[in-house]
Each structure stands twice: as C-alpha cells, then as structure tokens.
Amino acid sequence: MKLIKAILSDILIFYERIISYCYWNFKGVRITFLCQVSRKAKIESGCLFTGNSIITENASVGSFTYGHNVNINNATIGEYCSLAPDVKIGLDEHPLDKESTHPHFYKKIIQKKSIISNHVWIGANAIILCDVIVGSHSVIAAGAVVTKNVDEKTIVGGIPSRVINTIRNN
C-alpha cells in the first residue's frame, strides 16, 4: 500500500509540473520542465527560469528577470535582475528559543519578505535571508550571505556580507 501511495504521489507531482510548465509558458514566462513554479506566484512576462528552479506561491518576480537553479521564497524581486546559478532568496526561518528547531515543535512562523529592487545582479551560490532589502543597481558577490539591507548601487560580499564598493555611473 505504501508503494502505491508513493507512486501515485510521484504521478501527481509529474502532472503538476506539466500543468505549471504549460501555464507559465503560455503567460510569456519561460520555464523549463524541471522547474517547480507555483501557479500562485506572481511572475511578469519575459522572465526565464531554468534547471531545478523553485519559486513558491509567496514569490513575486518582475519582468525580464532570469535565473538557473534558483530558490525564491517569501520574496519580491524587481525587473531586469540577474540571478546566477544556485541563488537562494527568502528562505524560511526557524525559532531558536524552542525545544527543537523542527517545525513539528512550534506554530508556523509568519515569514518576512525579502525585497530585491530592479537591476540587481546576484552572484552564484549567494543567499539572501528573510526581511532583507537590496537596493536597485546593486551587486551581491558569489557565495555571499546577506543578512542586512543593502543600499542601492552597492557591491557586497562575504559571510556575513559587507560593503566592498559602491557603483558610480559615468
């Protein structure tokens, strides 16, 4: 019986991917078949997501933003953002003052959103935690862990991230 339930579950996941793939590509958002993109997410046309990208129902993405193998949850992302491979934005938090950090031991936490403004470039393997605002035209270096807000036209990197430089327009 457990095997049958597991097979049925896999079949349902497969059909959900087909429906999601058709839904988003029809709306002008290009996703590849392996992506898991909620139909409740808000994604503008012109976006491209490839690989095993995951975009949850709590996400909002502006037009012409793209990414490969990205994980977007509890986040609002602006237009024309470049997300390098394996970027993670707005991951869930767990309480540290409970018996356990496992979700069975506490009530659901209301997650705070991350906000990524327009024209932001986020390097490979960067992580942007919940409740962080990244200003427009900023750059997040590869592998950075962003725990605090980033001003516009700022380059940050490191763990935790710190300001590396500012961007000056010519």
Q: What do these predicted regions represent?
A:
Residues M1-R39:
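Membrane-proximal basic amphipathic "stem/tether" segments
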Residues R39, S45, S53-I55, T154:
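Soluble, non-transmembrane catalytic domains of enzymes that act on hydrophobic metabolites at membranes
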Residues L48-V132, P160, I167-R168:
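Flexible, glycine/small-residue-enriched loop-and-beta-strand segment within the central core
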Residues I140, G158:
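Conserved G/P- and acidic residue-centered "switch" motifs that form tight phosphate/ATP-binding loops
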Residues E152-G157, R168-N170:
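Catalytic binding pocket for nucleotide-activated donors in carbohydrate/polymer assembly enzymes
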